[in-house]
C-alpha cells in the first residue's frame, strides 16, 4: 500500500483507499479468518515503513527437502508450507508435520506494487522463463488460486519462488 501512485484517476484513488482499509481491517471468523492464522490483519505483518511494506515478523516454512531424485515437497495435503502460529481455538493449533525434514524462517515480503505485478500478462512471464540467458534456471510455477478452488491453474507471481498466483490468494 504505502502511498498511491501519482496521477491516479479519482476512481483509481478510491480503489487504493478501499484496499488500504481492507488491508488494515481485522478479519473475523464470519469472513473466513481462522481457525489458524498469523495475524488478523494483513497490516499485522506487512507494515514497515508503512502499511503494505515488509515487516519485522518472521514466519516458519516447512516441507520435505529436495534430493537429487525428487523435488521439494510442500506437503500441501497437510496444509502447505506456512506454519500458522495463532488460532482462535487452542485445540486446533497448527504444528510442523512430522514428515517435514526442512524448516526455514522467512521475512515478511514487501507488497508495494504487488498489483502491478499481477497486471503483467502471463505470456510475458512464460516467455521470459523460456528465453533465459545461459546459467539461469527460473521456472514458471502454476497453482490454482485460493479464491477459485477447483478452477484453472494460473502462473505463480508471489511468495517463495512464485508459488502463489494472485494477490488475493497471497
Model-flagged regions — what are they?
Residues 1-170:
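Periplasmic c-type cytochrome electron-transfer domains
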Amino acid at each position: 500500500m504505502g502511498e498511491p501512485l501519482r496521477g491516479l484517476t479519482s476512481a483509481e484513488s478510491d480503489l487504493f483507499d478501499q484496499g488500504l482499509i481492507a488491508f488494515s481491517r481485522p478479519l473475523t471468523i464470519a469472513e473466513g479468518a481462522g481457525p489458524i492464522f498469523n495475524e488478523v490483519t494483513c497490516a499485522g505483518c506487512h507494515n514497515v515503513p508503512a502499511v503494505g511494506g515488509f515487516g519485522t515478523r518472521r514466519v516458519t516454512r516447512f516441507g520435505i527437502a529436495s534430493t537429487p531424485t525428487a523435488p521439494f515437497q510442500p506437503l500441501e495435503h497437510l496444509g502447505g508450507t506456512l506454519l500458522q502460529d495463532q488460532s482462535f481455538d487452542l485445540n486446533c493449533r497448527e504444528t510442523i508435520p512430522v514428515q517435514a525434514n526442512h524448516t526455514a524462517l522467512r521475512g515478511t515480503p514487501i507488497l508495494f506494487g504487488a498489483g502491478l505485478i499481477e497486471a503483467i500478462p502471463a505470456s510475458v512471464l512464460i516467455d521470459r522463463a523460456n528465453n533465459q540467458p545461459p546459467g539461469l534456471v527460473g521456472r514458471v510455477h502454476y497453482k490454482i488460486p485460493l479464491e477459485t478452488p477447483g478452477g484453472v491453474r494460473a502462473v505463480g507471481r508471489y511468495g517463495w519462488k512464485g508459488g502463489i498466483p494472485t494477490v488475493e490468494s497471497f
